[in-house]
Amino acid sequence: DGKRAGEHSAIFYRTDKFEVLEHGDFWLSEITDRPNKGWDAVLPRICTWGEFRDKQTGFTFLFFNLHMDHVGVQARAESAKLILEKIKEFPKKLPAILTGDFNVDQTSESYQLLDGSGIMRDSYEIADFRYAPNGTFNGFHPDRKTDSRIDHLFLTKEFEVKKYGILTDTYRSEAKESARKEQN
């Protein structure tokens, strides 16, 4: 249900720095308000969102975290379109951050839909400094080297990225992605 069982895409944040003003989930499918498989997806997939306020500066932004289907090509493309629509639907036109396991690399249709939307930009592409000796997909083989990035961090134009890094010396099979974001 996205809360106590099944798929969930948590957003971890510093409670001493940020306040959550509003939050929720929606399912990556034609029916967004309850768990279900969308389009050609193999599993129900979810996107969690929050509206955050920086306690010190008052800067307010949206944060989305998702997990796209690992098989359904149509599901991933439609999920990308759905995310863009959800961002546009918010009554306040706030800056937005979109992260997650997209289950496809930077050459895929769903990636291109997001990065070419004019709304979201890949933090990897716009970073002033990039540390990425390896991609984020290794097929569960930690020693495999690849340029393939399946975990992405997209931003709206209000953000600039000073430093971007893919940290492959973690305990996970899929590497963490890190970008230092600053609003203009």
Range-by-range predicted roles:
Residues 66-68, 100-102:
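Active-site metal-binding loops of divalent metal-dependent hydrolases
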Residues 6, 44-45, 77, 81, ...:
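A structural signal for well-ordered alpha-helical segments within the folded catalytic domains
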Residues 17, 74, 78, 87-96, ...:
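Metal-dependent phosphoester-hydrolase catalytic domains
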Residues 53, 82-89:
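A generic secondary-structure signal
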Residues 63, 96-98:
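Hydrophobic/aromatic residues located in beta-strands of well-ordered beta-sheets
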Residues 1-60, 165-167:
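Structured beta-strand-rich core segments of catalytic domains in phosphoester-bond hydrolases
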Residues 3-4, 72-74:
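Solvent-exposed loop/turn segments connecting transmembrane beta-strands
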